[in-house]
């Protein structure tokens, strides 16, 4: 796509300087912006807040983001607020995100929910390129926005594709399409009467069935405490995926936060940094 057609674009490179991870080659324009990194609680890991200065995604918007994480670098990426997809009467919204992780690099990508309002059409394509020694924690939350009738699924569709490559080999292709006009997404086999959806990937060379079982034990009680469903499965590589159905965003955020904390403490021997958005 020609650069002039992007509604917003962002490029970011993070490298390890011997003491901590730092940024370079930062470029952004139009509706996308990245705030100067912060090192929460004297951490050596920078946290970047990605901002849509327009306040929401509109009819025909196109966004592009490319993040490079060099050898031994670590970074946390998050958004400053929810991604709001408003009605798109003429053309859908597109978002393309590429993440390139080198040796021993680590990416935490924990964004706020994607909210699709009435008559919204949204397409997101993520490409995640890892080496054998790099690792990743990535989350998504999908939430139905306000509609005049109060019904939950009044958006046109939400289409999310995640491609994960390790050493240039495709190991995971996740193609999620929620189209209320063509699918009974409220029924068994889709959302099963729930309205909110959450997912996470964790890839690390130490992931095995024992670790997956331990993570599941950590989060399984939420299904009894809250009205939600939680599942975890091993990816066809050294990683796992988590799926969550619920009626509230806060429940999904709590479960994903528990998983993120478990990873931080048990894999990286550190406490999770509070992102201080509010």
UniProtKB/Swiss-Prot annotation:
Main localization, broad class: cytoplasm
GO molecular function: nickel cation binding
Keywords: Chaperone, Cytoplasm, Nickel insertion
Gene Ontology CC: cytoplasm
Cysteines joined through disulfide linkages: none
Localization: Cytoplasm
Cross-referenced InterPro entries: UreD
UniProt-listed Pfam families: UreD (PF01774)
Family assignment from sequence similarity: Belongs to the UreD family.
Task performed by this protein: Required for maturation of urease via the functional incorporation of the urease nickel metallocenter.
Subunit structure, as described in the record: UreD, UreF and UreG form a complex that acts as a GTP-hydrolysis-dependent molecular chaperone, activating the urease apoprotein by helping to assemble the nickel containing metallocenter of UreC. The UreE protein probably delivers the nickel.
Protein name: Urease accessory protein UreD
Protein source organism: Staphylococcus aureus (strain bovine RF122 / ET3-1)
């Amino acid at each position: 796509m020609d650069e002039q057609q992007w509604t917003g674009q962002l490029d970011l490179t993070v490298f390890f300087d011997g003491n901590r991870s730092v940024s370079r080659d930062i470029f952004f324009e139009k509706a996308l912006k990245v705030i100067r990194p912060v090192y929460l609680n004297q951490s050596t890991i920078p946290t970047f807040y990605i901002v849509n200065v327009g306040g929401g995604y509109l009819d025909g918007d196109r966004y592009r983001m490319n993040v490079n994480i060099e050898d031994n670098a670590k970074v946390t990426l998050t958004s400053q607020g929810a991604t709001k997809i408003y009605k798109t009467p003429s053309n859908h919204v597109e978002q393309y995100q590429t993440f390139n992780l080198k040796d021993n690099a680590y990416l935490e990508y924990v964004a706020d929910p994607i909210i699709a309002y009435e008559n919204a059409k949204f397409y997101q394509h993520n490409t995640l390129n890892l080496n054998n020694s790099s690792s990743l924690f990535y989350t998504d939350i999908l939430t139905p926005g306000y509609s005049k009738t109060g019904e939950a699924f009044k958006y046109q569709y939400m289409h999310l594709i995640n491609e994960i490559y390790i050493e240039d080999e495709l190991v995971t292709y996740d193609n999620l399409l929620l189209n209320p006009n063509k699918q009974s997404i409220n029924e068994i086999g889709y959302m099963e009467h729930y309205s909110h959806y959450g997912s996470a990937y964790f890839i690390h060379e130490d992931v095995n069935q024992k670790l997956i079982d331990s993570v599941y034990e950590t989060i399984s009680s939420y299904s009894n405490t809250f009205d939600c469903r939680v599942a975890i499965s091993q990816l066809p590589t050294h990683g796992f995926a988590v799926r969550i159905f619920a009626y509230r965003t806060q429940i999904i955020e709590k479960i994903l936060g528990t998983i993120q904390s478990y990873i931080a403490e048990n894999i990286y021997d550190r406490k999770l940094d509070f992102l201080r958005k509010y």
